[in-house]
């Protein structure tokens, strides 16, 4: 059982954010605010969501993309963080798992995810 004051605070934090409905296997683009010295800028990070974890304001997603020289880069983002300005779903993936950690061992075309077809 959780404290009702904490639950009310978390609900107030969640209301302000516009988070789209997505799941593991979807390709997402996150607009992340980066602060360098006294300057701030927005950098897009696009990749496949390989895991969603947690609930409420503590919810996180793990996003994997392939960088230069075919090196996989994974970052964990708290969804309700102030540093995330926007989350956009680029394409829906057809997967049968909630956690796609097996993609770490695959390379090239084997690491592709089929697109989900709507009926």
UniProtKB/Swiss-Prot annotation:
Single biological process term from Gene Ontology: translation
InterPro entries: Ribosomal_bL19, Ribosomal_bL19_CS, Ribosomal_bL19_sf, Translation_prot_SH3-like_sf
Keyword Ribosomal protein among record annotations: yes
Gene Ontology MF: a single term: structural constituent of ribosome
NCBIfam families: rplS_bact
Assigned protein family: Belongs to the bacterial ribosomal protein bL19 family.
Physiological role: This protein is located at the 30S-50S ribosomal subunit interface and may play a role in the structure and function of the aminoacyl-tRNA binding site.
Protein name per the record: Large ribosomal subunit protein bL19
Organism annotation: Sulfurimonas denitrificans (strain ATCC 33889 / DSM 1251) (Thiomicrospira denitrificans (strain ATCC 33889 / DSM 1251))
């Amino acid at each position: 059982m959780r404290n009702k004051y904490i639950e009310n605070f978390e609900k107030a934090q969640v209301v302000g954010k516009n988070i789209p409905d997505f799941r593991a296997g979807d390709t997402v683009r996150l607009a992340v605010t980066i602060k360098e010295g006294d300057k701030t800028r927005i950098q897009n990070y696009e990749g496949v969501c390989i895991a969603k974890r947690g609930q409420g304001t503590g919810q996180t997603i793990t996003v994997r993309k392939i960088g230069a020289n075919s090196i996989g880069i994974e970052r964990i983002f708290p969804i309700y963080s102030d540093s995330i300005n926007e989350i956009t779903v680029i394409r829906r993936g057809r997967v049968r798992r909630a956690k796609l950690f097996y993609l770490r061992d695959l390379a090239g075309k084997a690491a592709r995810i089929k697109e989900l077809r709507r009926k």
